[in-house]
Amino acid sequence: MATALGFRCLFRTRPAPLCRHVDRLWRNPRRGHRLSPADDELYQRTRISLLQSEFPQAVYIDSYSSRGFTICGNRVFGPCVLLPQTVVQWNVGSHQDITEESFSLFWMLEPRIEIVVVGTGNKTERLHPQVLQAMRQRGIAVEVQDTPNACATFNFLCHEGRVTGAALIPPPGETALASLGQASE
């Protein structure tokens, strides 16, 4: 036991300074990218915590209306595209306006989007076959749903940690006359 304690003290003692250069290196060791196993673990870790407290890891849809969406507490008016940590206005009016060009944003991104959830309004509409074919050729799955279900699916996939995108068209609002007409029938 005494010898083990003696060896431990031996390694902690400072060598006699042979010159000022050796003494300076002993007080201020250089920390390079190649650390020896004897170095403290504190110097081997890299942490970035500033951005984690300011920005969420993923974009979540809080609510939707006929005017647009509430995404992470921010209101977005009109159709929009949701990407990991980004929201972009989308220049489409209805599902008929969705073209290969309007989806080109999804295959230009790195890391590659795994699945795109498309919300087409109040009901599920069919997209042009060429658009779906273009997405399949680039290895991106497409899920077409009505907007309320597309919002829920997008949130679920983001919660799972998948690299997900969404292209959402707000459902059209009901006018007071239309809702009164349905109520009287």
Curated annotation (Swiss-Prot):
CDD domains: Mth938_2P1-like. It is found in: Nucleus; Mitochondrion inner membrane. Strongly expressed in testis and weakly expressed in the epididymis. Expressed in spermatocytes. Keywords: Membrane, Mitochondrion, Mitochondrion inner membrane, Nucleus. The keyword Transferase does not apply. InterPro entries: MTH938-like_sf (IPR036748), NDUF3 (IPR034095), NDUFAF3/AAMDC (IPR007523). GO terms for cellular component: mitochondrial inner membrane; mitochondrion; nucleus. GO terms for biological process: mitochondrial respiratory chain complex I assembly. Essential factor for the assembly of mitochondrial NADH:ubiquinone oxidoreductase complex (complex I). Belongs to the NDUFAF3 family. Interacts with NDUFAF4, NDUFS2 and NDUFS3. This is NADH dehydrogenase [ubiquinone] 1 alpha subcomplex assembly factor 3.
